[in-house]
């Protein structure tokens, strides 16, 4: 693998880097005599926080101007007639987000934040009855998911024994699908809910959403299946409606590039809302923004839910958040959507993998040695089982920060304005995004990583 090959691949796969604001050495406060302060960074951290689309600043300023010019009247009479009055600010996003998650427009809503949305959905979909009380998920789940699952069972008077957690097996780096299927089989009479991440935040594993959902539903329609799509939305093609997923929640500040802490979203299959009459109404966390919009401002003490996922909204959404999401979704629409980007994403991450696995420092996943100097790739090596992220675990481990291999590699990368995500104690997550990363900068980033290891390895020779 060479720089020339990287440049050749960049000619084959277009970049949309010019749509985004890229941090520079200067803006990051990094002083390196080899680079001008205006030199752009290599940003491989979109799996943590995506970069800002250039149009976002104008989109937010337009709404700030509306606030200045008309105040509360902008809810129904926006000063810019080309823009949406605030009362309906989130509605234009539905046709933009629906294709990204593979849903009908009536199955999605832009609302809340990831864990708040997950909790709201659990209130509706976790319905323990008889011995069917348990939730199946992963041991290494993002902690916020664990807190949500633990608290929902406690709200119903159960304890943590009603949580079934699958762990990564010794000698493996991620959970194999067959183990999830086996766990569903073994607990099918006791399961109320199955909920996994679409993509595992730490390892980057892309779970087989369709296969797992279908199998659980075949065992019993009483088993509800939900997904945390924080690392999947905007990263890999999804088809939630056709896959028969009951519900899903996501954030929008990673691959959807909508800004820190930005508003999230939900999917609820239309079978739960399309005939949502009083006779079949299922209680949920309700609020006035989920009520019939024609009745909302009459202030009636009667909840008449919208016949769509919008009925799960509780409060009016943040206007500034929503337009930030919209500006990013418009970029996705402009470039042809996630499916169009997937071909480049697979090629880009495979290029990264090939560079890493051809290194003298590469240690195969099957190796049981923890003392050998180098790194393992925790992520599945099969492109179909991952998104754009590769998680690299450095060894041997040292508790002392000045000796820790990962800490030292990450510091070297940062000194060269290569921005990635560290997960203590020993993992760096590299995520080349097809929207704004190139093969050339991926090649350069890996060479800098090897330089860091060369410097450290002298202590082990």
Swiss-Prot record:
Its EC number is 3.7.1.3. It holds the Pfam family KYNU_C. It comes from the Eukaryota. It catalyses: L-kynurenine + H2O = anthranilate + L-alanine + H(+); 3-hydroxy-L-kynurenine + H2O = 3-hydroxyanthranilate + L-alanine + H(+). The lineage of its organism: Eukaryota, Fungi, Dikarya, Ascomycota, Saccharomycotina. Disulfide bonds: none annotated. SUPFAM superfamilies: PLP-dependent transferases. Belongs to the kynureninase family. The modification N6-(pyridoxal phosphate)lysine is found at residue 254. This is Kynureninase. InterPro entries: Kynureninase, PyrdxlP-dep_Trfase, PyrdxlP-dep_Trfase_major, PyrdxlP-dep_Trfase_small. Keywords: Cytoplasm, Hydrolase, Pyridine nucleotide biosynthesis, Pyridoxal phosphate. GO terms for molecular function: kynureninase activity; pyridoxal phosphate binding. Pathway: Amino-acid degradation; L-kynurenine degradation; L-alanine and anthranilate from L-kynurenine: step 1/1; Cofactor biosynthesis; NAD(+) biosynthesis; quinolinate from L-kynurenine: step 2/3. It is found in: Cytoplasm. Catalyzes the cleavage of L-kynurenine (L-Kyn) and L-3-hydroxykynurenine (L-3OHKyn) into anthranilic acid (AA) and 3-hydroxyanthranilic acid (3-OHAA), respectively.
